[in-house]
């Protein structure tokens, strides 16, 4: 029997048993599709984690005010909201040599307006190292100058989403916009970072110098002198991160005069630990998805076997 004879015999058998052939093919297709989908979901989730790591940095610590160590977040009250200050930032900079960059920040939300265009966005009042810590670069215009950080100058650097909303295809450099009721001059625009690992639009933001935010944007909030809402830092070498975290915690407890056994009035968040936890969760989910895909293949195989047996 030639190859053509074999092919004709096979086609004749398929036509004669089209239902069995269709169901057999469907079982194979469902099993393979399940495997492909499950693998794709696992790889997509891992890609999101990698994106989060690149956006947040694996050599970074974030310090926020509030009582309590670790656990499920800060237990905030009006008296514990401003427990960090610029003195803490400078102490970390000078006393912990493993720290590469450190910056304090204030933050809030505001309405940003230019001509007939307006949008609700978030603002951050920052110190010089903040840009290096967060991977921000200036793509148009220039960054803040040294005097801007000390004189409460009304200069602003805008994110890509804000630039596009207010100015369309223009850069907006040199234009005056309003944050709330306060006029600011646009001196620069930031590189686009897209959606963050937690789903937020990282480009929907404007930056002003820390002292500018304190005097111009915080309003009647009644900040303690030199207070900041956040301190972020990076270390030069990732292997020093855990050691630096311990040093930072000890330094802040000393500066804040926290007695042994008392709770911290701050929280230190280790980004690498968060990423490790999320990665472990993703790996577990990938294993579960793989098990589901395997079950789908087995069920498909059993279905094929049953159809073949019935047709005999």
Regions found by a protein language model. Name each.
Residues 6, 10, 24, 48-49, ...:
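Hydrophobic alpha-helical segments typical of transmembrane helices
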Residues 29, 38, 230-234, 267:
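Short aromatic/hydrophobic contact patches that present stacked aromatics
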Residues 42-122, 129-132, 147, 164-165, ...:
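Hydrophobic, regular-secondary-structure patches
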Residues 124, 128-144, 148, 153-259:
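Mid-to-C-terminal secondary-structure elements
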Residues 232, 240-241, 248, 259-293:
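Peri-transmembrane interface segments
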């Amino acid at each position: 029997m030639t190859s053509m004879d074999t092919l004709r015999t096979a086609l004749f058998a398929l036509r004669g048993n089209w239902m069995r052939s269709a169901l057999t093919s469907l079982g194979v297709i469902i099993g393979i599709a399940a495997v492909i989908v499950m693998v794709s979901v696992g790889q997509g989730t891992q890609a999101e984690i990698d994106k989060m790591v690149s956006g947040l940095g694996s050599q970074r610590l974030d310090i926020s005010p509030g009582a309590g160590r670790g656990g499920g977040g800060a237990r905030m009250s009006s008296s514990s909201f401003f427990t960090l200050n610029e003195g803490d930032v400078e102490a970390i900079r000078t006393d912990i040599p493993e720290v590469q960059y450190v910056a304090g920040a204030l933050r809030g939300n505001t309405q940003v307006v230019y001509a007939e265009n307006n949008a609700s966005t978030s603002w951050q009042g920052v110190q010089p190292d903040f840009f290096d810590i967060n991977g921000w670069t200036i793509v148009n215009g220039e960054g803040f100058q040294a005097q801007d950080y000390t004189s409460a100058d009304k200069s602003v650097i805008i994110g890509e989403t804000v630039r596009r909303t207010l100015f369309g295809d223009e850069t907006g450099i040199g234009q005056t916009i309003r944050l709330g009721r306060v006029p600011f001059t646009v001196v620069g625009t930031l590189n686009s970072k897209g959606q963050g690992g937690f789903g937020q639009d990282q480009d929907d933001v404007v930056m002003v110098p820390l002292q500018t935010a304190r005097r111009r944007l915080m309003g009647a909030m009644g900040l303690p002198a030199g207070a900041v809402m956040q301190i972020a830092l990076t270390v030069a070498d990732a292997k020093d991160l855990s050691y630096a975290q311990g040093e930072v915690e000890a330094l802040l407890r000393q500066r804040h005069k926290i007695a042994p056994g008392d709770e911290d009035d701050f929280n230190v968040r280790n980004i690498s630990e968060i990423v490790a936890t999320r990665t472990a969760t993703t790996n577990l989910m990938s294993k579960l998805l793989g098990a589901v895909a395997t079950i789908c293949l087995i069920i498909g195989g059993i279905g094929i076997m049953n159809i073949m047996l019935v047709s005999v």
